[in-house]
């Protein structure tokens, strides 16, 4: 997911996407623990997408306060 795509989302959409990514991260963690994880790079990608969404959400909330 690109930062430009994330910036185009509303705060509600960001919250929904963040919840979906956290669920996927949870599932990937269990797959890794049981040895069923095939796409190991997906863990890193999900982690960075979560960070990207949190960063942009914080920027948007800081922009509203200023």
Curated annotation (Swiss-Prot):
Pfam families named among the record's database cross-references: Ribosomal_L29
Q: Which GO terms describe its biological process?
A: translation
Please name the InterPro entries in this protein's record. Ribosomal_protein_uL29, Ribosomal_uL29, Ribosomal_uL29_CS, Ribosomal_uL29_sf
GO MF annotations in UniProt: structural constituent of ribosome
- The gene name reads rpmC
The entry assigns this protein to a family as follows: Belongs to the universal ribosomal protein uL29 family.
> Can you cite an annotated GO cellular component?
cytosolic large ribosomal subunit
Q: What protein name is recorded for this chain?
A: Large ribosomal subunit protein uL29
User: Keywords of this protein's UniProt record, alphabetized?
Assistant: Ribonucleoprotein, Ribosomal protein
Do you know which Gene3D superfamilies this protein is assigned to? 1.10.287.310
Database matches in HAMAP family: Ribosomal_uL29
């Amino acid at each position: 997911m690109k930062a430009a795509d994330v910036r185009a989302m509303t705060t509600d959409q960001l919250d929904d996407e963040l919840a979906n990514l956290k669920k996927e991260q949870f599932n990937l963690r269990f797959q890794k623990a049981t040895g069923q994880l095939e796409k190991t790079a997906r863990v890193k990608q999900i982690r960075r997408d979560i960070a990207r969404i949190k960063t942009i959400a914080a920027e948007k909330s800081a922009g509203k306060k200023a």
